[in-house]
Amino acid sequence: MKIKTKQITVTAIMLAICLVSQFFKNLSVYITGPIINAALILTVLYAGMACGIILSIITPVTSFFITGSPVMAAIPAMFPCIMIGNIILVVCVELLRKKCGKAAGFPVSIAIGAVLKAVFMGIAIALIILPTFLPAPMHKMLQVLQLQFSVTQLITAVIGGVYAVIIAAVLKKTSLAQAD
């Protein structure tokens, strides 16, 4: 696979947006989450699935380094699950947006991807990893963390998808949206 300059540029810009948004994660996951999900979706749309997958893998790591989550530090097994959740969203958008028809395909693929991402993370993280590996001093946070890694993931992915649909509509007439 040959990566083109446009793909590198789009991916770099989306990564920069993700990095800046991650500084606000301690304010609210409802600020950072939708921005990162929108960036993942837009990366797929304008740079391709491979670049979206790369960003899906990088963003959980950069988030940890920027915000330093004690839960992530205590349970490193969550990293691959978050990465896989992001990849599920990216792959759904890429594979389903064309299959569901030109007009409805993009939003439908986002909705399906958001649900599948939340279901995967809800099962893998909220129901398996957290109850099994959460250190005893953190057990009082279990219900909040389970909510954060299931329902909150659905909400932030859907909001990010709405942002992506709006941004893509605005960018539709630009050279960025034109096929190479």
Language model region names:
Residues 1-180:
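Loop-helix junctions at membrane interfaces
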